[in-house]
Amino acid sequence: MPDFKIVSDFALTGDQPQAVEKLSEGLAHGLTDQTLLGVTGSGKTFTMANVIARVNRPTLIISHNKTLAAQLYSEMKEFLPENSVEYFVSYYDYYQPEAYVPQKDMYIEKDADINEEIDKLRHAATRALFERRDVVIVASVSCIYGLGEPEEYRSFVLPLKKGQSLRRDLILRRLVDMQYERNDIDFSRGKFRLRGDTLEIQPAYEELALRVEFFGDEIERIVSLDPVSGELLADIDEINIYPAKHFVTSAEKMAEAIKGIQAELEDRLKELEAEGKMLEAARLKQRTNYDLEMMQQAGYCSGVENYSRHLAGRKAGSAPWTLLDYFPEDFLLIVDESHMSLPQIRGMYAGDAARKKTLVDYGFRLPSAMDNRPLSFDEFKARVKQAIYVSATPGPYEKEHSQQVVEQLVRPTGLLEPVITVKPTGGQIDDLLEEVKKRVDKKERVLITTLTKKMSEKLADYLVEMGIKTHYLHSEVDTLERVEILRDLRLGVYDVIVGINLLREGLDLPEVSLVAILDADKEGYLRSEQALIQTMGRAARHVDGQVIMYADKITGSMQRAMDEISRRRKIQEDYNRLHNITPQGIRKAIKDINERIRSVTAEVSGPEFRPAPTLREDIVRLIKELESQMKKAAKNLEFERAALIRDRVVELRAALETDPVNKNERTK
């Protein structure tokens, strides 16, 4: 198996070498919990990649939202291009969980829109764990939710080998058991087709399809092919085909599960009738019997995940199988932005249980549905042997449990923590306007954070009236639009962005030289020590970074935040002086923030949003895919979407005609 190998134009600098050394030694000495306290812009991701390469173990990195996970995934792929870096987040573009509101007697059915691209990446992630050890999976909190049993999933793998004798009807039956669908017309993900002696399969985890050619019952040839153009690409001697879904169950297990569900239904009906809940009993009987009939006839039903305990043969109350169970025992866990991610992981179990309990109490689900759930925090910790928590502001859990805290305070660029000024609230808007104008004159950018939506809107409107190019960033803005707005800030379309709690972790905005915090003395979640340090960090990527807090008194949180920033700044100044370093501003390609996230974020559902490929054959393939999407959109009367796709096709065709690089790429 290959080892991890870092590929980068840069060597470890600043605090990075000692951080990598200490964390790696800590892992080697068996430390279970360590924290990397790394300031904004210190290269924490590069440090993480180097630690992974040093210890050479499969690694799970958890991030608290899809956008940051996408950013981290992209960076890890750049640092570890020869290794398997995968992406595992929720595959729902839209998700409305099943629920019941007793006060209104209102039942809400589950409704979801699955993103096929994200589902493909999830399957690629689990497949990688079965085939190699040099694997890094960047995941959201989705990784603690139920997945099929690893050993059951592995038992369904179909190995194919050139020269192997295998009856075709057995292969077809096996593919159906693996949840592949036969479709001779629509050849897409998770489907197969048979034409004479040729079987074609589109695996659930691959861009390319497979063609298996038979001579009688002998496999004569296995070849990969482009599913759009039909072009044959490369011969393959042997390959494993993995199931099309993570939840796969044998016929024997399905029969056992149905018996278990029927027995549980009988017991639960007796309970409800004894309590005088006749309506609930009738409802549960009707719904469960319908599901059982569907499972007997079709092998699945809507909401089949609610019977996962029976299907997996688990005991009542036992933890579900999750992505963590697909990893080998010695895997390493890294929790990015742990002050946000750990509370999120901790809170998932209770929230899910409260919703499910109502469904069970009112006869919509059997009690076993409670076991279709995320891991509790204790169950999560029990599956992790060694963890590294990464944050600029570690939370209480990290501080209490870490056996070693490694600080990474010095930036490779020599940049210092921002200068902090506290000003009174009297006349704050006029003062802020003057400060903003100073930055605008120097072509620098400003972030302003307020406590309320109303205040943000009013301030943004006022700044626009004063001739300042301003945008208000609010919670209703979706992920992609938010990225566009931040990109426009960098490009100078806007000079100022006003927001509430949207300007914190993981934003790379080197042009921002001023962060203004209004109502800084209003103690609370948005003005806690952690929140203030994170917000101040947005100005730490600029040589002249400054933070202005408008307040009439200095709260405990403000003082602690200022003391911590001052401590870090002194360490940075001493390091720069000792090594004769002059702080350098960060120069970052503006397209990165947008293109990088566009390419993998789950919020983007259509190929018309994908960045243009570089190779000619990839562009041709994308054009064919887009034309298919365009016709489908027009057929569904989605004319605006069809027009958008058409415009993208025109752009790509023009690029093919005018770009000499693409014209000659194939011949290089």
From Swiss-Prot:
Helicase ATP-binding domain: residues covered: 25-412
Domain Helicase C-terminal: 428-594
Binding site for ATP: 38-45
Stretches assigned to the UVR domain: 620-655
Entry coiled-coil feature ranges: none
InterPro entries documented for this protein: Helicase/UvrB_N, Helicase_ATP-bd, Helicase_C-like, P-loop_NTPase, UVR_dom, UVR_dom_sf, UvrB, UvrB_inter
One Gene Ontology cellular component: excinuclease repair complex
GO biological process: nucleotide-excision repair; SOS response
Entry keywords, A to Z: ATP-binding, Cytoplasm, DNA damage, DNA excision, DNA repair, Excision nuclease, Nucleotide-binding, SOS response
GO molecular function, one term: DNA binding
Superkingdom, taxonomy of origin: Bacteria
Record motif Beta-hairpin, residues: 91-114
Localization per Swiss-Prot or TrEMBL: Cytoplasm
Gene3D superfamilies found in the cross-reference section: P-loop containing nucleotide triphosphate hydrolases, UVR domain
PROSITE patterns, sorted: HELICASE_ATP_BIND_1, HELICASE_CTER, UVR
Subunit relationships: Forms a heterotetramer with UvrA during the search for lesions. Interacts with UvrC in an incision complex.
Family affiliation: Belongs to the UvrB family.
NCBIfam families to which the protein is assigned, alphabetical: PRK05298.1, uvrb
Function: The UvrABC repair system catalyzes the recognition and processing of DNA lesions. A damage recognition complex composed of 2 UvrA and 2 UvrB subunits scans DNA for abnormalities. Upon binding of the UvrA(2)B(2) complex to a putative damaged site, the DNA wraps around one UvrB monomer. DNA wrap is dependent on ATP binding by UvrB and probably causes local melting of the DNA helix, facilitating insertion of UvrB beta-hairpin between the DNA strands. Then UvrB probes one DNA strand for the presence of a lesion.
Entry's free-text remark on domains: The beta-hairpin motif is involved in DNA binding.
Protein name: UvrABC system protein B
Source organism of this protein record: Dehalococcoides mccartyi (strain ATCC BAA-2266 / KCTC 15142 / 195) (Dehalococcoides ethenogenes (strain 195))
